[in-house]
Amino acid sequence: MDLYGYVACALRLRYGVLDAFLNVYNPDELSAMDDTPFSLYLTRYDCTLETLRLFLKRGVDVNGVRGTRTSPLCTVLSNKELGKEAETLAMCLIDAGADVNARGADGRYPLLCLLENDRINTTSFVKYMIDRGTLVCVRGIDGCGPIQTYLRSKNVVLETLHVLVRAGASIHDMDKKYGFNILQCYMISHVRSSDVRILRFLAGQGVNSSQGFNATFMFDMLERKISYGVFNRKVLDFIFTQISVNQQDSLDFTPINYCVIHNDRRTFDYLLEKGANPNVVNFLGNSCLDLAVLNGNKYMTLRLLRKTITPDAYARALKVINYNIYSINSFGMREFVTRHRTMYKALIRSFIKDSDMEIYTYNHIYDFFKEFVDECIRERDAMKADVLDSVSMFDVIFGRVSRIRWKHVRVISKYVRGAYGDKVKKILRSLYTRRFKTNRLVHYITDLCGTSCLWTHLPVEVRYTIVDYLNDGEIHYLFMKLHA
């Protein structure tokens, strides 16, 4: 076995054996594979500073011999199996005279090899290379410059970007194949781990493309994040500075449509907070409500029912339920319908409340939920017929009056045990809480004013009426101000 064979085949290099081979064989002898024992050695996982110095002691060419595919420095910087040891070995080669700008026969440059190796592309090592005179205007065989190469690695740090930009690296390089700019390249490579500080930095450097292409790209990136279940509020805030929350793609899907399809609850809630329209219809004729029902997503369905839903959206969702009940004798459908019974009843209850359309047209729904449907209709009609001071209890309960007064408590309490009891209970809880705060403030003002003040001469009901005209925030603020 010669030196080349030993370096290629040994499970682990032994210092003494390697030293003996180096005394006999030339470490720069070119093989039929266009590499040398030295270049092959640098690809191993167990390179150490001691064995490298042994090669250097034997006068090995640190810039590589003519005919090799790449330079020794590029080989070390590309060897991820070495981990942090690659940094030490590279510094040793540079101290021994390796050219930091040597371009190998394969077209690679040391700086680009360093930047794509996420094990060692630290800010300090990049600074070290720049201080040693490495050029930052080089291009790889794929046409990518230093920043584009760095952004594709797994270890992207804002400080390193600052170092490269200050050194003169171009931030306006375009992807040669697809025409992506640097910002877009970063987002493609880091769908799961985008850093909003880097996004803002790149955008602040004037990185941009045509408005239409940028909007399409941002929408695609958002859809990928949703499909992966990645949620980062700051990154989403950045994306929605580029596109609208109701942006539609070529298939008329909006971001919230994709959230429902992929069951991404966090982004779904975020978009509703931002004012996304759940009633937008895609080219397949689906909106968020019927998609949520199709997926059996109870959480999203109940959240959507708190929003304003159009009659068409209700109709599509009810058709889904109607068909599911029709298919109840099919394999697995009875279990599916039973499991989502609560969700179906919530949708039916909301439809009867909001729509003038008849539920009876969905004959399978009516047959399956007959008692519940009749109860909802009876209660809705009773609320509309129950009037106090020209205001129906239906308008009071479902938020069609500016403010619910304490006088409504007795009337709406009789609906607590009905189909819409949960809504009534929520209203009563808020009224009792407000009553407590009002009562507390009235008594505190009375104690504060004493017996000689005009406030104490007012009738008690007038005092309560005055305080009751304040909203909850004003009552809390006034109490805290007086209590301070």
Swiss-Prot record:
<dbReference type="Pfam" id="PF00023">
    <property type="entry name" value="Ank"/>
</dbReference>
<feature type="repeat" description="ANK 2">
    <location>
        <begin position="68"/>
        <end position="102"/>
    </location>
</feature>
<dbReference type="InterPro" id="IPR018272">
    <property type="entry name" value="PRANC_domain"/>
</dbReference>
<feature type="repeat" description="ANK 7">
    <location>
        <begin position="284"/>
        <end position="313"/>
    </location>
</feature>
<dbReference type="Pfam" id="PF09372">
    <property type="entry name" value="PRANC"/>
</dbReference>
<feature type="repeat" description="ANK 1">
    <location>
        <begin position="33"/>
        <end position="64"/>
    </location>
</feature>
<keyword id="KW-0677">Repeat</keyword>
<dbReference type="InterPro" id="IPR002110">
    <property type="entry name" value="Ankyrin_rpt"/>
</dbReference>
<protein>
    <recommendedName>
        <fullName>Ankyrin repeat protein T5</fullName>
    </recommendedName>
</protein>
<feature type="repeat" description="ANK 4">
    <location>
        <begin position="142"/>
        <end position="173"/>
    </location>
</feature>
<feature type="repeat" description="ANK 3">
    <location>
        <begin position="106"/>
        <end position="138"/>
    </location>
</feature>
<dbReference type="InterPro" id="IPR036770">
    <property type="entry name" value="Ankyrin_rpt-contain_sf"/>
</dbReference>
<feature type="repeat" description="ANK 5">
    <location>
        <begin position="178"/>
        <end position="211"/>
    </location>
</feature>
<feature type="repeat" description="ANK 6">
    <location>
        <begin position="251"/>
        <end position="280"/>
    </location>
</feature>
<keyword id="KW-0040">ANK repeat</keyword>
